[in-house]
């Protein structure tokens, strides 16, 4: 038995080398999407349409005694079924041009410096921080996450420095390619078969680690309801975030920690919970301003944490008297190698946290941050002290 995965374009047989077409007609079983199978009405063997998950297809191919060909769009290893099937079966892969290659050729742009991602069959959540700042972004779409939906999504984060190149039905009889503003794309209908390239035509705003406090929209700036820049920077450093970290921000308030974390964990997921509805709305305004698409929940932790994916990093800015129950959930669900960072203002909260972590088998390290900022006084300068903060870092004991 031999299994060949052959890439095919929207122009069907015209996209195939003669050798590939010969293999198809000599095979016993031809497998593919209905659209691909329709190109081979005269195939004499068995035709199997791919429907639903791929696990049943793998079992079918494992038991196949004859030669089988699997048809896939473009390059089977570029967000295609080839990646999955090659880990389960002994296959040979013969790619066609990927839709992204074709789209860049139509745009007449090089593509080795582009960022590639897909929202095909996937949630669009988190896309904003993943792509923010890249000069060129290639995106595989689907009917739900269409170019129209994508344009509206990007507009909601103010990402108007991008133009959208939409390539429809590439290689087919009804091929159409357009370079549009986001506003234009947001009001158009597109063929379901399309790919999108975002091209930056103006510089994107840049926010380095340690965003100034007054950059954030604050509901009560005079009340200090924000993790101050210096404390925020130290706390995020203690979390030791990776590019794909899953992060919880408990008691998010303005969302400052969630936002800074998202700039590091761009490929990860950011979750934030806040008990005060007005503060949560304030957080959402900041998320939009700083181009962070986080999961937000209104509730008093641990309420709402069951909606979050298991974390690699947890920041706790406030517990509202529920430290024990919050730490129960955080410690039990923390992924291997993860960290919890808790900010405490009082000695009593420090003692409670240290005791709670020890009882749960966690090792702790504490930094007392006593920050003072320079402040002008007439023609001189003095220092104005911020409240001392205990930064407690906890990880599972070895």
Swiss-Prot record:
Residues 206-398 are annotated as: Cobalt-precorrin-6B C(15)-methyltransferase (decarboxylating). In the N-terminal section; belongs to the precorrin methyltransferase family. Pathway: Cofactor biosynthesis; adenosylcobalamin biosynthesis; cob(II)yrinate a,c-diamide from sirohydrochlorin (anaerobic route): step 8/10. Gene3D superfamilies: Cobalt-precorrin-4 Transmethylase, Domain 1 (3.40.1010.10), Methyltransferase, Cobalt-precorrin-4 Transmethylase, Domain 2 (3.30.950.10), Vaccinia Virus protein VP39 (3.40.50.150). Signal peptide: none annotated. Its EC number is 2.1.1.289, 2.1.1.196. Residues 1-205 are annotated as: Cobalt-precorrin-7 C(5)-methyltransferase. SUPFAM superfamilies: S-adenosyl-L-methionine-dependent methyltransferases, Tetrapyrrole methylase. NCBIfam families: CbiE, CbiT. This is Cobalamin biosynthesis bifunctional protein CbiET. It is an enzyme of class 2 (transferase). S-adenosyl-L-methionine binds at residues 227, 251-255, 274. GO terms for biological process: cobalamin biosynthetic process; methylation. The keyword Protein biosynthesis does not apply. It catalyses: Co-precorrin-7 + S-adenosyl-L-methionine = Co-precorrin-8X + S-adenosyl-L-homocysteine + H(+); Co-precorrin-6B + S-adenosyl-L-methionine = Co-precorrin-7 + S-adenosyl-L-homocysteine + CO2. InterPro entries: 4pyrrol_Mease, 4pyrrol_Methylase_sf, 4pyrrole_Mease_sub1, 4pyrrole_Mease_sub2, CbiE, Cbl_synth_CobL, Cbl_synth_MTase_CbiT, Cobalamin_biosynth_MTase. Keywords: Cobalamin biosynthesis, Methyltransferase, Multifunctional enzyme, S-adenosyl-L-methionine, Transferase. GO terms for molecular function: cobalt-precorrin-6B C5-methyltransferase activity; cobalt-precorrin-7 C15-methyltransferase activity; protein methyltransferase activity.
